[in-house]
Structure formats: C-alpha cells, structure tokens
Design a protein with these regions (language model features):
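Bacterial N-terminal signal peptides that target proteins for export
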Residues: 1-9
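Ser/Thr-rich, Pro/Gly/Ala-heavy low-complexity intrinsically disordered linkers and tails
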Residues: 11-80
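N-terminal substrate-binding region of glycoside hydrolase catalytic domains
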Residues: 77-232, 236, 276-278, 320-322, ...
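Conserved, mostly hydrophobic/aromatic
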Residues: 105, 192, 224, 248, ...
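Noncatalytic carbohydrate-binding groove/subsite architecture in carbohydrate-active enzymes
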Residues: 196, 203-210, 237-395, 401
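Aromatic/acidic polysaccharide-binding cleft in carbohydrate-active enzymes
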Residues: 365-446, 460-466
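Carbohydrate-binding surface patches
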Residues: 463-509, 514, 541
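C-terminal beta-strand-rich structural cap/linker in extracellular carbohydrate-active enzymes
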Residues: 523-548
Length: 548
C-alpha cells in the first residue's frame, strides 16, 4: 500500500514502505530528530504521565506463600535471549543511538532504492549510498553502526523497483508460479547478501554503480527479508510467493544461475519470508489465513524443489490487536488472546516446518485517540503509559507462545496530534514522537532489554491472586533468574502486597519498575522473608531479579 510522507521524500518511494494490516495505512517516518544518546533523558512524550509516579511501582513489603514452580503453561519457551528477541521497525534515517537500546532493527528497504538504472534490464547497477536523490544514505554505515553497538539489523526488501514496472508480481509475460519469473528479484537479494553477508564473493559478480565502493563480505547482516505483507496489498498467494522465495533463497536450487539468491552469495545468510498480515477483513480468521498461505507455499515447494521444502529460514507474521471498530480503542494482549493466536502459528510450525523460528515482526499501538488502534487512558495512566504497558505484555505473550523474535512497530510517529492524519492507524504508534522525544514505551522496552539481556524465558508460574500474571526467566550468564509480574487486566487494577516466592537458596532480590525517563528503570532492594518478597502488582509489568 503506497502512501505519502511529509516533506519531499515521496518522490523516491517506488513501493509500499509499510503495508498496514487493516484499512488505511501510515508508514515509517523519515524525519529523524531522535536524540543522540541512548541514555539521554530528554523531556518525555506524554508529559507527567511519563514519570515514575504514573505507574504502580514495586514495594518492599514482605509476606509468605508457597514457592513457584515454572511450568509449560502458556506455550513452548523460545531459546532466544532477550537481547536478540526484542527489536523495533525503523528506517535508515533513524538514529542508531535511539535504536540500539531497543534491540534488533528491522529496516524497511524499498527495492527501488537499490538501483536507478532504468535501461539495464533486468539487472540495474546497485547503489548502497544512493545519489538520486542526494539524501546521503549509507547502509554500510547504518548496519555497521548497529553492529558496533551490539545490535543486529536486517533489511526488509519491499515493494517493486521502477524498472520492473512497479509490479510486485512478474511481468505479464512471466508465470506467477515459476521461480524463473523472479530472477531479477533473486539477483537483487544475491547482491545485498554478497555485500552485507559474511562471505566474500568474486569482484567480477558485483553489480555496482561506478561511484560505489566495490566491497563484499562485510559481515554486518545475517538475515535478509524478501518482502513485507505480501498477502496484503501485493496480492501474493502462497504458491506465488513460494516461487519468488525459491529464487531469493538459492536461485531455485541453483537452476537460475550462479548469482541468484542469498544462499548463493553467502551460505551462512538466512532468508526471512516477508511478514504475513493475515489478510484482515477477508472473512478468514488471522490464524487460518496464515496457515492457508503457508499450506500453499509448502505444496508448491513439494512439487517444484528437490528438497520439497518451502524456501525460507524463518516463519514471519504480523498481528495488531484492533478493537471492535472506531472509536473503540485497541485491545490489550490478554483481552485479544494474542498468546493463543501466536501459539497456534508456533504449533503449525512444529508440525509442518520444524526447526524454522517464528518471528512476529510487526505489532503495536497508537497513542492518539482518533486512531482505531489507539491505547486508551486507564485510570491515572495516560494512553502513552498504557501503550508501554501493553507492548511489554505483547512481548511476554510472544515469549509464552514460543515466538523467537518480536519487533515493535515502530520507532517514530509519522504525525503530530491533533493533525487529522493522526486518525490513521499506525501514525502515532512510534516509541518516539515526531519531535524525537521518547514516549514511556521507549523507556519500558529499553529497560526490559537492558535488565533481561542475557536471560531466556522459562515459563509461567501459577499466581495466587486473581488476574496476576507471573513469567519466569533464567540468566544464561549466571545462576540467577528473574520474574516479571503484572496484572493481566485493562482497568487500572492493582494487587497490593502480592507475595512472590523465590527459588530456594535465593539470597538477594531487587525489583525494577518500568518508568518513563529512565532507560534502566527504578531499582528497589527487596528483603526476602522465608523465601518470599512482596510487591504491589499493577498493569505495568515489574521485573524482579534474584540471585543465590
């Protein structure tokens, strides 16, 4: 779905920047304006609600209850540590310093940006620092900058280049279900994997504009996504997409030549299928739309590939918790059953595509009340605070379902309220406002990742109070662990003095409250009594860290 952006940027957008999952769409911002330091404390978007006083923090009261037993309730645990699990959608113009604290970066990357030669079909020369127009974009520096800050980034190549007539499907003289129809797309995927992947290729196979540095094997990108919501506006069916994926993956098992596909360029590279939207409004359920698409992709692959395998390394989905319709607000992850929906996709993967991780690469909430995807104000908590609460709870639902990566949409707002454009879904879903000022959600996500960076999800723990949710984590770098505790309600509920049992031989514990204005939260020492600590539990998740 194409859309216009502010300033003069639309002139170079040849394909959709972001295809929303329902109705009208607003895409990623290109205005920058983010702060320069990951731990800078600029004025927070949302005013007073961004402060610590807006959230019910952890208390240091003591009490007693039976000890926890982490179980498998809520789905299979993913193996990813939190530093590689959580991430954000962004653009090259976004500040690396603002991206890095959130984690993995999914970079929207229009196919048309990669070449401007309209007369050299089907293989235009590739650009990595485009000169038309002269915005000075440099993807080499972008991905290396993320890597230097300990964060991985990957491009989501989307839309179509102008030299293929702005069509996502093959030209009229090509068969939509023939991998050979996508040789130009597979060639592009080869070129970017050759440059940013880990394997150097022969200089003679590089297709570059004359002003581009001749480089390969830079080792800054491992994953390469080959579309965005192909089942939405682009109109791909599963079999059609499987044909393109076969070209993008390994040049249709090498049949398309020695310079087609990411695996041909770098055997270590991973191809991520474009994130599926689930065709909102089609009459199908989201889960059945996803599985029907994957069924068709698998059927095509069984008939056309000798390995009989759908050519992707990752199962990739998008889901947003829309409410029943404007002006109703969006739904919390618990009210919308997000965990069960994602778990159904994971179960399908387990049965039909074992070994391929499931990623959830778009989810989010707007903060402007005119949007059909807006987080509501609840009690004393503003929409800005509730956005942050629900995003963390979305991450917890994904972990419980067995999802291995989750990237929130998106870093920046694309409009400033009360402009009418803000009534469009996704326009105010950013973690930063248009001024570059972080919302509470940015701080919540940064704290979640910073505090649990080396931790893996273990499972849920049965709670002793109604509506209290408890998730348990283990530290891969030590013998300690963590709980995350929250109310799974959407009415500003608080359970005071909740008794949380700690594992045997725990000697120290501390609570970390997610708070606007602080990228690592507010830490409070807890004193265990008979192996138990107490804390007030609110709808803002609280992290409890413990160690022997």
């Amino acid at each position: 779905v194409a859309f216009s952006l502010r300033s003069l940027i639309p002139l170079v957008f040849f394909g959709a920047m972001h295809c929303g999952s329902s109705g009208a769409n607003a895409g990623p911002s290109l205005d920058g304006g983010a702060t320069d330091s990951a731990h800078a404390q600029p004025p927070s978007e949302g005013g007073a609600e961004a402060s610590a006083s807006s959230d019910a923090g952890a208390s240091t009261e003591t009490g007693a209850r039976d000890g926890p037993m982490a179980d498998s309730e809520g789905g299979a645990a993913g193996a990813a540590t939190i530093d590689t699990f959580v991430g954000v959608n962004a653009l090259i113009t976004d500040s690396v310093a603002n991206l890095a604290p959130i984690g993995v970066v999914r970079e929207y990357h229009n196919w048309g940006w990669l070449g401007n030669n309209f007369n050299d079909l089907p293989y235009p020369q590739t650009l990595y620092t485009p000169d038309i127009p002269s915005f000075g974009w440099d993807w080499d520096s972008f991905f290396s900058g993320l890597q230097a800050m300990g964060v991985s980034g990957f491009p989501a190549v989307q839309g179509a280049a102008p030299w293929v007539n702005n069509s996502a499907v093959p030209p009229a003289d090509g068969s939509p279900t023939a991998a050979a129809s996508y040789i130009a797309h597979g060639d592009t995927m080869f070129q970017i994997a050759a440059r940013w992947g880990k394997t150097k290729v022969a200089d003679s196979v590089l297709k570059l504009e004359s002003d581009q540095a001749r480089k390969s094997g830079l080792g800054t990108v491992e994953y390469f996504e080959d579309y965005n919501e192909e089942d939405n506006a682009a109109g791909f069916t599963g079999d059609v997409f499987a044909a393109m994926a076969s070209a993008d993956y390994d040049g249709d098992e090498g049949r398309l030549g020695a310079t087609i596909g990411v695996k041909t360029a770098d055997p270590n590279a991973k191809l991520v299928m474009g994130g599926l939207s689930g065709r909102y409004g089609s009459g199908d359920t989201w889960v059945s739309s996803i599985t029907t698409f994957l069924d068709a992709a698998r059927t095509w692959s069984a008939a056309h590939r000798t390995d009989a395998t759908f050519a992707t390394d990752v199962v990739n989905v998008h889901y947003y918790s829309f409410g029943p319709g404007a002006p109703a607000p969006a739904l919390s992850p618990e009210a919308d059953g997000v965990e069960a929906k994602l778990a159904a996709v994971v179960s399908y993967r387990d049965q039909h595509m074992p070994g391929k991780p499931v990623w959830w690469t778009e989810f989010g909430y707007d903060t402007f009340g005119g949007s059909p995807l807006h987080a509501p104000a609840l009690g004393s908590n503003s929409a800005f605070v509730v956005q942050g609460q629900w995003l963390i709870r979305e991450l917890l639902a994904a972990l419980a379902a067995g999802v291995e990566r989750a990237t929130v949409f998106e870093l920046d707002d694309t409009c400033a309220p009360p402009a009418s454009a803000c009534n469009t879904q996704f326009a105010t879903a950013g973690l930063l406002g248009m001024s570059g000022s972080p919302k509470p959600a940015w701080y919540y996500l940064a704290t979640f990742r910073a505090r649990l960076s080396s931790y893996t999800y273990v499972g849920t723990v049965p709670a002793t109070e109604a509506n209290v949710r408890v998730a348990q984590f283990a530290d891969t770098k030590g013998s300690g662990g963590a709980f995350v505790v929250w109310m799974g309600t959407s009415n500003a509920s608080v359970t005071p003095g909740y008794a949380l049992s700690l594992p045997a031989r725990t000697s120290t514990a501390k609570a970390v409250a997610l708070t606007g204005g602080l990228a690592t939260g507010i830490e409070t020492t807890l004193t265990p009594s008979a192996g138990v600590v107490t804390l007030d539990v609110s709808e803002t998740p609280t992290i409890v860290l413990y160690s022997p």
